[in-house]
């Protein structure tokens, strides 16, 4: 042990010094680094330190706050035995990495044994899938006071909406709660909890079953009690979860979310319209929205909501991504260091048909987003297992023209090989005057790959020549597809 825990100087001026001669403060710095870089409660965490020698043991136990000492109980941890042996430290209840190594009954008993220590439980993270029977037992217990509880994460083992609903008084006595994450678990009385959880910073509601539907009005009412909320995810399981009617809300009644910087939504446009009509989030800089399959959706309130966010007014790059199951429009600032470089905005629709996807892009640009005067780079890419047919009918040509029309400030257009013929073919159908009104600021065309096929080369040549003759020359470049 001494050989492993020693360090020798160089030359004859330095004597050999063992770690035992280091002062307590230095040892604590080393211990702190060790504890924060190892899995809590694992074999290489702080329990290893207390078995080295009596001095280390005393030093560790005398510094529980400095070292943030915690006990980790998993479903395979014999909680009653372990908690009787170790000091009365804060408890983390975690799914662990090998849930299948214990029977469901034994795992449930271990979790419930740890929950008996109401005043010590700090984190409950059961993200590997909680069975309905265990969820009922936990939910019943969590109606009791848990004064130190800060984080709760439950992921239902059933993603079909069959998980039991959480009771009205769930977590009603957890005043220090900072993070709540529920996946595929209905909680119709969420609004009641939010009024008592004023310290909540992270609220993640994913895969919300229809049985757990929360109206936009109830959601906004609950959010009004969370001035420190920084991250918010609201994702419904199906398009069945929608408001019965859109209510007109006067702008003077909007709820301010001053700390919110991250927002994710999945659902129908009507719900998002009702929600964004009632809130303001001036610091928001990362938005991700996924609509269920909707060909027509009005999002005027979403447009106004985005327009009120200062950090989203300087987005200079856009990418349209066509995938097998969805289409996505992503916007970001120019890739350069700076405090505003973390701004992100993405709009997606879950649909498969290419004409529906093109229509969605048009609606994103015309109905959901304010004008884009700072958008100078446009990337259009396709990620499909099968290629689109080579033919380009009149309907698709018109859809491409309509989808590209809002990008009036774009100087650089990047196209993947799969889309060159389709995009340039559509633009070439326009008369000379109309053709230059499309992408009027375009200066450079970037084509993926270095050896375009004969058909690609023909489309490229015709487009570049047409722009040259119209007095709007375009430089041709090759590029390698980037990952944002």
Which residue ranges define each predicted feature?
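Leucine-rich repeat
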Residues: 1-484
